[in-house]
Amino acid sequence: MIQSVFSDDAWSIWEPLIETVRPKGKTPPRDLRRTMSAIFWRHQNGAKWRSIPAELGPWWTAAQLFIRWAKLGVWQALFEQAKGQDSALGLVFLDGTNIRAHHKAAGAAKKGDSGERRNDREALGRSRGGFGSKVCVAADGHGKALSFTLTPGQAHELPSAMALLDALPHAPRYVVCDRGYASNQFREALWDRGSRPVIPTKRNEPQVACPKWAYRHRHLVENLWARLKEWRAVATRYEKTATSFMAVICIAATADHLKT
């Protein structure tokens, strides 16, 4: 017997947030709690929609709601509601990870484009780690996600950095990154924004100050990725479209914010 993903206490937290962001012109499922449990079960287990246990309701109800809300930006809005305005922006960490795509993730409609353009549109590409996507995150001083970018797997992390920071309510005091972000131009851009860069230099670069006490906390963003990848549909991309995959990431990040 599959129990609801949401205990009474958990649902008392989730329900008002969902009611805030769900489309008001649409009638919610008769049992929204059960449908949400089905969506969560599918993404936590990386299963096919048809594999959703019957106790959680018709699989097509869950699939239709997930896809419709993904296209409307509801899951992104839910993530924004969950993170609130009390994020710890003294330290902000930037980090990216490659997510390998399941072979069925490459089946999105071409819409008149070539296969290459289709893959670029859906944030899919081939890197040394295989065929997949690059997901970058900005995390706060508590190790909680603040913003995401999604690009093809072969993309470098640095071009996504400013988009991650632009999504924050104000400039953080310190921006902590690994050597993949080492660039004098990027450091200068951070200073111009009022943020101090905490980025180790590469071996072929002149030494630049990098406060060790701040860099020592970079494990917080690594731990965030470890938690998010406990969702099998985050650790492996099963979604054909970038919109749906970003929705999965937002659901996992929302759950991480609301975890007690």
Where in this protein do the model-derived segments appear?
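Short alpha-helical elements
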Residues: 1-260
